[in-house]
From Swiss-Prot:
Gene: glyA
Name of the molecule in the record: Serine hydroxymethyltransferase
GO process annotations (BP): glycine biosynthetic process from serine; tetrahydrofolate interconversion
Plays an important role in substrate specificity (site feature) positions: 224
Highest taxon of the lineage: Bacteria
Sequence similarity: Belongs to the SHMT family.
Function text: Catalyzes the reversible interconversion of serine and glycine with tetrahydrofolate (THF) serving as the one-carbon carrier. This reaction serves as the major source of one-carbon groups required for the biosynthesis of purines, thymidylate, methionine, and other important biomolecules. Also exhibits THF-independent aldolase activity toward beta-hydroxyamino acids, producing glycine and aldehydes, via a retro-aldol mechanism.
MF terms (GO), sorted A to Z: glycine hydroxymethyltransferase activity; pyridoxal phosphate binding
Enzyme category, top tier: transferase
Signal sequence interval, chain numbering: none
Keywords annotated in UniProt: Amino-acid biosynthesis, Cytoplasm, One-carbon metabolism, Pyridoxal phosphate, Transferase
Subcellular location, record wording: Cytoplasm
EC code(s) of this entry: 2.1.2.1
UniProt pathway: One-carbon metabolism; tetrahydrofolate interconversion; Amino-acid biosynthesis; glycine biosynthesis; glycine from L-serine: step 1/1
Length: 415
């Protein structure tokens, strides 16, 4: 088990430092999580050596019988997990999955209607700096002044735009997404409907958030975040024709050989998601996020939409004299890792922002519950109340490190 340590101590030393960082810091970036040693072990397996262009039973290389077996297992487990008919587990990331759907279902300059990035959307939902906003004509809907999606307004925009594809899903929206409403809107304007559930997939799998099926034509997700699997992407549908187009779009459309070792790890992760204890984890994720939101509101902070239904909390500082970047850096000094984030009504640049996004997945994976989240939320508020008090931040960091070391998740950097 010491091959890397003995062969390349310089690399191993960096690994050890990252392990120490992950152990000592309270990871509260909503898109990050701690995957299991079994998933990491699968990613470091002999499958990292195998090329397998194509799909099970239709490869361009020989010697793929076991690559076929592991990919078929991942597909079957994903189908069971999400209750769908067709799954492509080859996308290298959520962005690749979204790009694959667009290539499959759209032509250049077709219209996309997605959620505004500053209102909680994602780059790949048509942002002008992303390929999705360069290849296609992108239009946006957002949230109202209270931070909720206004479905009547979405319908009004859709009637004007007449998009070929509507994208529902977000990277910083703390409320339940009403897929049925989006289906009604899509049907009214004759659009296809895609759900990007990258952030909430683990909740959907556990029944803690409504499923996008049967309302959406196609569904994309990452396999990490709330699913706690390896970093990767996936596309799902119940439509055989769409599935065929998507398979061709992923390979040979935008990718060559799949990452078979990552697909193996996806299979392991899906196996974990199918276990009864997964439902308990997902439920605790929501409870912990709700605890966090309640404490912050009680401490006088503006939680966007007035709370949360999922794993994340979005805090706005539009009423404060400091920025999201200031808060991000101050909390980092206190041993709490969050990310600066744009908020509804944003007045600052995306590099500065007026808010932060805080998530519960990683600390819930470490075994923390309401008591710990109440304590941490109060420490977050203490930091924000004293945004420039570096000495206080360092004192709080000592307390947070002591707390973190009670919930150690890894005993070594590689598995």
């Amino acid at each position: 088990m010491d091959f890397l340590k003995n062969q390349d101590p310089a690399v191993y030393e960096i690994f050890e430092k990252e392990l120490q960082r992950q152990t000592d810091h309270l990871e509260m970036i909503a898109s990050e999580n701690f995957t299991s040693p079994a998933v990491m072990e699968a990613m470091g397996s002999v499958f990292t050596n195998k090329y397998a262009e194509g799909y099970p039973g239709k490869r361009y290389y020989g010697g793929c019988e076991y690559a076929d077996a592991i990919e078929e297992l991942a597909i079957q487990r994903a189908k069971e997990l999400f209750g769908c008919e067709f799954v492509n587990v080859q996308p290298h990331s959520g962005s690749q999955a979204n790009q694959g759907v667009y290539l499959a279902l759209l032509k250049p300059y077709d219209k996309i209607l997605g959620m505004d990035l500053s209102h909680g959307g994602h780059l790949t939902h048509g942002a002008k700096v992303n390929a999705s906003g360069k290849i296609y004509q992108s239009f946006f809907y957002g949230v109202n002044d209270e931070g909720w999606i206004d479905y009547d307004r979405v319908l009004d925009i859709a009637k004007i735009v007449k998009p070929k594809l509507i994208v529902c899903g977000a990277s910083a929206y703390p409320r339940v997404i009403d897929f049925k409403k989006f289906r009604e809107i899509a049907d009214e304007v004759g659009a296809l409907l895609m759900a990007d559930i990258a952030h909430i997939a683990g909740l959907v799998a556990a029944g803690e958030h409504p499923s996008p099926f049967p309302y959406c034509d196609v569904v994309t997700t990452t396999t990490h975040k709330t699913l706690r699997g390896p970093r990767g992407g996936m596309i799902m549908t119940n439509d055989a024709d769409i599935a065929k187009k998507i398979n061709s779009a992923i390979f040979p459309g935008i990718q060559g050989g799949p990452l078979v070792h990552v697909i193996a790890a996806k299979a392991v992760g899906f196996g974990e998601n199918l276990k009864p204890e997964w439902k308990e984890y997902a439920k605790q994720m929501r409870i912990n996020a709700s605890t966090l939101a309640t404490v912050l509101m009680n401490r006088g902070y503006n939680v966007v939409s007035g709370g949360t239904d999922n794993h994340l909390v979005l805090v706005s500082f539009l009423d404060k004299d400091f920025s999201g970047k200031d808060a991000d850096e101050a909390l980092g000094r206190a041993g709490i890792t969050v990310n600066k984030n744009t908020v509804p009504g944003e007045t600052r640049s995306p590099f500065v922002t007026s808010g932060i996004r805080i998530g519960s997945p990683a600390l819930t994976a470490r075994g923390m519950k309401e008591a710990e989240f109440e304590l941490i939320a109060n420490k977050i508020a203490d930091v924000l109340d004293n945004i420039h008090d570096v000495n206080l931040h360092e004192k709080i960091k000592e307390e947070m490190v002591a707390l973190a070391r009670k919930f150690v998740i890894y005993d070594r950097p590689t598995y």
